[in-house]
Each structure stands twice: as C-alpha cells, then as structure tokens.
C-alpha cells in the first residue's frame, strides 16, 4: 500500500471512529470507547506520519486533499477537513504544512464550492499556528485566488468569495498579529486590484490607507518643491545624497514599498531642470544622476531635459527685444544660450547624451512650432559641438542637422550678410559655418550630401568663400570687426584655410616676435610686445574648436619660450597681451582639458623643468589674480605642487619664494568650507596620497591651513562631531611634526571643540622671551667684536641651521637701532641664508620686536623700533610688509603682548605713508573688473614705475628681479589683511580698538578682493559668538567691504536698501529692529531669484565670486542677516514667522517654495540661528493641545500640510514641522547629525503622549535614509530613543488605550527592515518586554518574542494586564518562529556597516522574508 493510500485510509478510519459510521452489525460502543478509538487512530496516524520524509508528507497530504476534493457530499467534506484540523490541533500535522498544501492544491478552485469553503474555514482556524513566513505565503496565495474570480460575481460563487475574504481579513487583523503588517503592505503594493471584487478591493484599500500615514511620517513636507543652491564646490556625497535621482526615471530614492504621495513617486523633472539651468552645475548634475566620466552612460532623461532647455531658450528669444550693437553680452537670453552651449558640449562629449537624438527631437518639436527668433543662437550652440567633434566622427552622425535647415530657414530669398562689426554676426553666420564643416567632412569621406545650401544662406556662404581666398585675407588683422572670428569658426576643420586667420589672431597678442630664439630680450627693446589682450567679446565669438586651437598655440609658445636656451632664466619676454588672453581663455569650462588641466599637467611642469623662473612667476601670479571658478581638486593639486616647489634650491630666491608662498596662502584661505574635507582628506587618508598639502617649512602656511580647517568645521557644522573629523588628526600630526607651534587662548576659544581638543594635545615648549633678548644681545656683541669679513659670514651665515638660533634679522634690527645703518657684509649673509630659511629669522624678529615694545616704557623707543622695522621694509628691502604682518598676526601672543602686536601692526601700516600711498594710488587708478579692460598693463606699469618694488637689499648681489605682470604689494597684502582682521576679532573689544582705524585706511583694498561677500560670510559666521554683542563692529565690517565696491558694482547688488540706510547712519545707531515685512522682503527677493526673476543686476558669472544668481542671493542674504543688530534668536524667529505669521501674504501655490528658501537661509547660518527651530519645535510639542488632544481631526491630519491648507485647519503644528524639515534637508551632515542630541535634551523629557511621539516621528522619519548613508550610528541612536519614548508614553498613560500604536509599530518595522536589521535586537527586546501586551504582541517579530511570553514582565507592574493580549482569531500556542529554522526570523545584517545597502537590496530582503 502506498503512503498516499495509507494516509487516506487512516483519515477515513479516524473519521469512522469519530462519527460512529460502521458497516457491521453489533452493539454500539459508548462515547468513551469512540473517543478512545479515535485517539488510537490519531496515534497510529502520528506514528505513520512521523516516519515519512518531508517530501512524502507533502505528497500524502496533497493526495488526501485531492481525495477530499472529489467527494460530492458537503458534510463528508466538512468531516474530512475537520479530521485534518484536529490533527493540526493535536500537533500531529504542522499547521503550516497543511495550509501550504491546501493553498497549493490544484483542486482549490472556486468552482468546487464545498471543498473551497471547507478548506478556507480550516485555514482560518489553524493559521494562528503558522509562523509569520508561512502566513505571508498564505497571503500571497489568497491574493492569487482573489484575482482568479471573474469580474462579475454571481450569487452562486459569492459564498466562496466571502470565505476567502474572511481569511484575508483575519490575516490583515492588527489584533491577530499573524505577521508584521509591513510585510502585508509590501506584498499588496505589488499588484493592481482594480478588477477584484469590491469586498477584497475595499479591504486592501483600507489597509493601504493605514500605511499612507506611515509614508507621511517618512516624507519631507513639500519634498517635490525643494531646490538646492548650485555651487561650484566639489560635491561630496553628503551634499548630494538629498538630491540624488534615478538616472533612468528621475525618481527619488524612497525606501520601502509604501504608498507615498503621488508627487514623490513622479519623475523629479523640476529639480533636474532647475539644476541644469544654473551655470557651473554640470558636476552636480553628474553627481545627482550618478554619471561617471569614465563610463559611457547614456541618460535619456538628461537628453530630454537638454532639449527642453533649448526650447525654453528659443521661447525666450521670441520675447527678446531686437539686439543691440553692443560688443558685450547684454541680454539675459544671450547668457542662457552661452550656458546652454557649455552644458550641451559637456554632456554630449562625455556621451551622457547623444547628439543625433537631441537634434532629431529638436527638429520634431520645432517643426510644429513657430519659433524662429532664436534659430541663429541654436545653430551657434550646435556649431560648438560640430566643429570640435566632426573630424573624429562619421558624417552620418551629423546628417540629422540638415532637417533643421528645412524647419528654421525656409526663406525663398537670401538673407543679407550680417554686419561683421557686430559680435552677433558670428551667431548669424553659424548655420553657414556648420554647412561648410559638413561639406568638408563629406568630401574627406567621399560622401555625397546631394543637396545645395538653403537659399536663405547663399549670400552668407558666398561672403565666407570670398573672405577666405588668400588674396583677400593676406592683410587680415584683428581690428574692431569679427571677420577673423568668422573665418576661424567656418574653417577650423580645414587646415588649408584655418592657419592664416588663426595666425593673424595669434599675432595680435604675440607680436611679430614668434620665435623666442630670435633676438631674445633685444627684440623686446626694439619692438614693444603687444599689451592689449583679445577682448571677451572676441573670445566669445570664437567656437570652442577655435578657442582650443588658440589656447594650444599659446601654451606651445610658452613652453618654447621656457625651453629657449637664449632666454635668460629670470627674464620673461612674453607679451602681456598673450598672458592676459591666456588667463581669459581659462574661464571657459568647455576647454578644460587644454585649459586648467593643461596648465597644471603640462605647462607648469615644463616651465619648472626648464628653470624658466620668470615664466613660472608670471603663471603663479596669473593663478592668484586672474583665475576664476577653478575646481577645488585642481587648486589643492597646485597647492601640493607649490609645497614641492618650495623645497627646490632654485626657488630659494626672495621674489620667487614670496610668490610661491603668497599663491599658496591664497589657495589655502580661498578653499570653500564644504571643499576642505572632501579635498584634504584625500591627501591624508588615502594610502597613495596624490601629494602633500602640508608645508614642510612654512609655519605661517600651516597655521593658515589650521585656521581654514577651523572655519570649515564651524560652517559645515562638523566641529562638534568627532566622527566627521577623524581625518583631521592625521593632518594635524603632520603639521605639528613639520612646524611645531602653539595657539593663543583667544584663538583656541574660537576653534570648534573637536579641533580644539586635537590641537591642545600637541604640547610645544613655550619660548623664553627674556632668553631671546639675551641671545640677540650676545650675537650683537659678537658682531661688533668681529672684524674679518669671512669670519663674520662664516659665523652669521649659518644662523638658523640646526644648533644655531635664527637671529640674524633680530641682529640687523638692533644694528639699525644702534647705528642707523647696515653693514654691506650683511647683504652677503642674507644671500647666504636664503629666502626660505629667512622665514624662521622673521618669526624670531616678530617675537623680539613684541618683547622690546612690551617692555619699553619709553614712547620714543617704541617709535624708534617701528621706524627701524619700516626701514627694513621700505629702505633696505630686507623683508616685505605682507610677510612681516602675516607673521606678526599669527604669532602665539597672550594678553598684553597680543595688544602690543596689534599696536605694532597699526604703526607699521599707518605711521609712515609708504604703504598708504601705494594703496591709495592703486585703488584710485585700477578696477577689479580686469576682464573688461584692455589697458590693465599700462596702469600696472605706471604703478610700478611710481612705486618700484625690490625684493632684495641689493639686486646686484642677488639675481635680477623677475618681471611682474599682475601683482603688487597691495594685492599680496589682501589675504594677509583677511587674517589680520580675524585676529582682531578674537580678542576682547578693549584690545582691538585699532581695528576701526585699520578698516578706515585699508578697507578700500577690498575693492580687489576676489571673494568679498564670501569673506564677509565666513567672518560673520565663524566669529558669530564674538560679534554677537558688537553690532557696531558688524556694521563696520559689512559697510567697509561692500562700500569698497560702490564705484564698481551697481546699486542694490548685495544688501537691501533698508540695510544700506542702516549702514549710512551714525555709528551709535545700532538699535534698529526690523519688522516682519523686512524679513518677508528678504525671503521674497531670494525666492524670486530662485524662480529665475532677474532681481540682482546682470553680471558676467564667469568672473563673479558666485557661479549663479541663487548662490549670490543666498550669501548676500546671509551676510545681511548676520550683520543685523539683532540677536540670533530674534533673526531666526522672524524668519520662521515669515511663514507662520506671514502665511496670508504668501501665494498659496508658492508656500512650499518659500519654506524651501527659508530652509536654505537658516541652514547656511550658524547653529545659534538654525538651532532656534528646535526651540520652536519644543514649544509645539509641549503645548497643552499636544498633551490633551481635543481636536476633532487625528494628529496625522493636522500634521499633513495638504489637508491643513485645503481644510483651513490649525496650521502651527505643520508649518513649524515643514520649516524644520526644510532646514534639515538643506543641512550638511554635521548639522543634521545633531538631531539625536536635540531629541535627547529637548524632546525626550517632555514627551508623554502618543501625539507628541507621532510629531517627533514626523520630524526624524524623513531623514533616516540620509543618516543611514552618512551616519549609521545616528540611526541606531534614534531608533533606541524612539523605543524608549514609546515605553515612556506607555507608562505615562497605563490605563488609557493607545489609539495610534499600529502606525508607530509600522514605522518601527520599517526602521528594522530598511536600516538596522538585527543589530539592536538585545537592546530593543528588553524595552519591548516592558511594554503593555498589545504593544508586545505587535512588536514580537522584531525580537522573536514568543506569544506565551507576552505580558510576563508586566505582572509586577499591572497584574490585571498580565498575560492578556489582543484577541486572536485562532490557536497561538506555539512560537511564531524558531531561530535558525526555515520558518524563523528573517535573515538580517549582523554588522553595522552591512545595514548601509541600497534600496533595491533592502526591497529584495523584505520580499524574501
């Protein structure tokens, strides 16, 4: 007998014994006898069943069910199924096995009514004994069975539907807790239930609705309206994570298969478009879409948005007034096309977008529109790419553009030849230039285009053909017209015709002396080198291909110049026009490979290799004073090169060494706060570091590096987060190893706590100033006692070498004080010491000078000391004012000595007129807008002729001076002035009274600061605590920097008229308290800028300190807010009240945009400002309405912005929540990671109700995803706090029912399966065991809590609740799962780092549970 038959027979026997169904005659057994026989039958069944393998058991049960399904009698079917249920109740058949076999039975079809009904009734009764994994499988089968019903259900099959509905309803029952509801929603979200019976559909819809509020707790209010500020900084992951999109769908990365709001599930086209529209956004776009340059990733979504940008530009051109003949780019639309050209070239060049697809899509759109005004601009954009790439690609790749000619140039008559004196002629001739390139490529490939040029362009074509003939362009030169540009653009791919116009263009800036070996310096004397560079208008009129040819020619010429053996190494006979033009070409990001990459990777190494120090000096000056928007990794790379360069013996020359250090100082102080960690950590943490960013010898540069690090940590909010700054330790160790030093207490107090702790760990012995004075006196006695020159040089020339103190400058100082002169032999000693070693002597001189003045009670002696130092600077040229003041500002001085140093700095700068005269002259005759000038060099020479600058005491002894093209003492002093002002701000007000005087006299120099608003922002942000009670000084700082530019910038370019009025009032007028309308105006101004309205005067963003209008708007707004005579709390509360109280004046469709803008502003302010939002949140959470909920609406309704706005409900809760979420969304990781601390300190002590807890869940829920990626520990901390708060709420109201325990538990399951796994199992289990039984039952799957254990830990607390749980629909006597078995708890990550996985992996994990 087969096992299948045996099992069926045994079931039949049990059935007979139980029902007394006998076929023989005889006395009827009594009830007890029947029961005994049934039990014996079950034991027999159990024995047989236990001996079977799992596969045999399944087959046997399957056969048994098939047998039962074949019975036509309803009662007999019921009795058979009752036997199987009883066998489950006795533990003979596992409940899961029976349910699985029932649900998978091929006979379980709704047409078999009896079998269907009885089966689902059995499942309904035994499912309580199935572990949650088995229940999940049963639910899946129920879903499939529900979908098997016809759309129209007759009364005959309604009972089957009702039985199925009961089982599904029981599975969905929250009190039954058969499996985590999180698994149910994950499963039902996968299918479409539109065609299912209304009972099932209603059941599912209601269950989904329960999870809508869970998704609400995980969603940022107005997320789809959030927009970032696009900066030209390097985009570290922690800055991009909030903005990442799927490159295929453009959708947000939302975790969990939850019913999020529809706008969150849609492609975020608005976000990508906004970013694409911003200049200098290409890196952010690549980071957002995870596009890698090294991989050829086609992004169709990006192609579509590039086409959209083109169409928008075409529409803008339709509205544009007729263009002027102005040579400069004057209209907003022209800037749009310029930016569009850059974007298109970049994304097509790296094959993220396909040129043919873009052109074809454009043709399709333009063919059905009547947009013609922008056609020339469009063809100009396409010409940029075509001219540079057509030689490397087949002609067939470009043929789609021919269709555009048909759509855009349908004229039957030729268009007139444009005026070639107008730069726009290059755009008007662009379609003809494209045609010429296509013909040339077709000719080289022997491809027949087989069509003539459009009639509209015939005259243009004839004009260019005539112009290119040798007899017509033989005398061409760069005049005021654009014929050369036209020829270059049209024939850049035709060497026969391109060489002559390009040669003429180069000759304009190079002069006739093309061969550096011919004549050397004598040629320069006989024939002056060109000084007028190519204007930006001319460069803009050239295609990218022509620009690349031009920059290649310039670099080649410079390298040949450097390699020329007849050129004196320290001289430089490069034409000023050439150098200035080269610097202007470097602003074009489209030619980056030949631009900044070529500068750092080719030109600088070749110049250095050739020891062409004059050219090297010029290039470093150019980088300091002419380069804009250079990506941070290039700047840090150059800094590393400069540190290597500084150690080379050949650069140990005063002027060159000064230039290297000055350039390095600018690079260090110019690093953006968000750039510091991203760039510096590469040089510290990577095993194969690309170089060294720490100076081996310059203490001043390393101090500046630490100050920049401090500022970065403060502004990015990482100064309190040790986890954010682990890499700093290695950097500081390297600095202290190379240049050991200490810091003044007033400076350390301004350092962020983490950096302060790291710095004070390095103990450096403090120098004895009294001993220093004795040593100087001793050296001076040695000097006066020695007469032999060789002995003097031998003794003092080794000063500063190991074992000998670097006191020679102190000696010279004392020599001048005593004798008013310097011995000629001192010059030889200075030359022997060298510029590099002299830095150590300068530090000793500063210490000695401060000690002398501090201990001098005689005012005449103080004046003598200052006069002596001035003589060393201006008369003897031993040291420079910038290096001395920098060194003096950075010395470690406390108390009276610090005050003395400030006094010395003031006297050095202002007592004599030497520096003041230079500054006044330079400021009065020059403009910082060098890109608009063609006579910079003339003014530069005039200044140096009036104020010649020497870098050595006697140039006949040393090397001859290097030619200076850009710099002077005033420009070199700017970064020093920045640092000096910061030192003043660190000390008490009584010690820094002289700062006002310095600002009065030196403030105009900020006219030439390359980042004036950024400097103000950094200063006011970093020193906010020091300046909080000094409103007059804040006003003075802002007024000085912004006022210095009043003659250069248009009105209202930065601060508002209200603030300008405040600045213009008397110094004591610091009691201005702006009203709410003022803050509304500030927010509206920035919001309008983000929306694309031209609020600020137009500017060339290529030369601006900010890359685009929204970035400019953000920083000028922050500067103004930081400069107000109002405390942080007042400003922050007013910004929050812009929405809370100003809600009626905000357009309803723009309210989320305004909240986004407020979040941007607040996140960019110091913690004392954005921290106020936690105070406002605390006020909301602790308000009486939160502790005693009297609203008719649920908390989820009042915390839903859309519902509140549409139903006009109480808005305070949700508005504060929306602003808080906006601030956190825009915050850096250093700021957002503080949320854990704020919850512990501000919220945890006051949360007693579930309404308060739900509000907190709305606050932190949306940011778990980001924290998991960047601070996984924070997710664990927040999770633990949420469980502790749940216990706190539970204990606070033990006799009250918790109305919203289900959504809270659902959120906790989301956290488990999406973030923490089993990592916190032991911590959480202890808390769960202390909760009320209803909560224990719901959370039992998190910690594998058995049903029979629920309520045990409650007995000592609440005897009445002990052992009680929610009503269960079936037997729950067995464990829901067994650890380590197939039906056990889902496999989850065991290590913290394993929880940081991508959403698809986590989704798959949930699906596999």
From Swiss-Prot:
Region (Disordered), start-end ranges: 1359-1409
Record keywords: Activator, Nucleus, Transcription, Transcription regulation
Domain of life: Eukaryota
InterPro entries membership: Mediator_Med23
Record localization: Nucleus
GO cellular component, one term: transcription regulator complex
GO BP: positive regulation of gene expression; regulation of transcription by RNA polymerase II
Function statement: Component of the Mediator complex, a coactivator involved in the regulated transcription of nearly all RNA polymerase II-dependent genes. Mediator functions as a bridge to convey information from gene-specific regulatory proteins to the basal RNA polymerase II transcription machinery. Mediator is recruited to promoters by direct interactions with regulatory proteins and serves as a scaffold for the assembly of a functional preinitiation complex with RNA polymerase II and the general transcription factors.
Self-association state and partner proteins as the record states: Component of the Mediator complex.
Similarity field: Belongs to the Mediator complex subunit 23 family.
The protein's name: Mediator of RNA polymerase II transcription subunit 23
Organism: Aedes aegypti
